[in-house]
Amino acid sequence: MKGLNGTLRLLNNTNFSYKGQWIPVYSDTVLDKWYIGDFMSADYTISIDFDGQDKEIIKCLVVAGIDTASLSVYGRTNLGNNIVDVSATVNNSFVEVVLNLDSLGTRDFTGARAVFSVNYYCTVSPLIA
């Protein structure tokens, strides 16, 4: 239903569930890519599933300028093992959010599956180098 101020109004006890196309995680796996002329920041929920006992969910924020990006993980939980590291870089005016297998881990999680949801926030100011 249409909500106030251009929002979407949901009925009580209505939620979203995500089971999108998953991405296998290997070295330098690009999870998402966006142009900084369109968006300046994004809020991610990343769900990682390796097997029945190794699962992880990560909440992170990304903000980017013309030649730099900053990523902050503000929430993370798992069943005992960190599975991935998350980073963001700017390359030719595009932000890439990248997953790598956890560098400090004692297990090999090669091929873990990632699913994500994201809210993008539009760039307001013109890009000036």
Spell out what each predicted region is.
Residues 1, 57-60, 84-87:
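Parallel beta-helix/beta-solenoid repeats that form elongated, surface-exposed shafts/blades used
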Residues 1-16, 44:
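Low-complexity, small-hydrophobic/phenylalanine-enriched stretches
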Residues 12-41, 49-55, 68:
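Surface-exposed ligand/attachment interfaces on beta-rich extracellular proteins
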Residues 42-44, 97:
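Hydrophobic residues positioned within well-ordered beta-strands of beta-sheet architectures
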Residues 45-65, 101-104:
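Short, flexible beta-strand-to-coil junctions
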Residues 61-85:
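Terminal beta-strand-rich extracellular "head" domains
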Residues 77-129:
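Low-complexity intrinsically disordered segments
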